[in-house]
């Protein structure tokens, strides 16, 4: 049987080393949310577990402070 060859090219990390996960950085938070405003899973985001926890807390803080919507039902 013929097996497909996977590319050995490394993917870039979704968060660069200089970027800080903060609730005030809305442009960064939006990259890890769906169009509806839901938090995307770690498998889709390709974040580490620590980064995912920090991202979740930051998104929830931004929602509480009305910087980001809880739901985005605009279609």
Curated annotation (Swiss-Prot):
Keywords: Chloroplast, Plastid, Ribonucleoprotein, Ribosomal protein, RNA-binding, rRNA-binding. The keyword rRNA-binding applies. GO terms for biological process: translation. It comes from the Eukaryota. Pfam families: Ribosomal_S18. Disulfide bonds: none annotated. GO terms for molecular function: small ribosomal subunit rRNA binding; structural constituent of ribosome. Its main location: plastid. The keyword RNA-binding applies. InterPro entries: Ribosomal_bS18, Ribosomal_bS18_CS, Ribosomal_bS18_sf. It is found in: Plastid, Chloroplast. GO terms for cellular component: chloroplast; mitochondrial small ribosomal subunit. Part of the 30S ribosomal subunit. Belongs to the bacterial ribosomal protein bS18 family. This is Small ribosomal subunit protein bS18c.
């Amino acid at each position: 049987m013929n097996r497909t060859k996977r590319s050995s090219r490394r993917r870039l990390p979704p968060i660069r080393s200089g970027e800080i996960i903060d609730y005030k950085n809305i442009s960064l938070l939006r990259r890890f949310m769906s169009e509806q405003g839901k938090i995307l899973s770690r498998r889709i985001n390709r974040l580490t577990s620590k980064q995912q926890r920090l991202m979740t807390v930051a998104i929830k803080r931004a929602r509480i402070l009305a910087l980001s919507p809880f739901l985005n039902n605009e279609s």
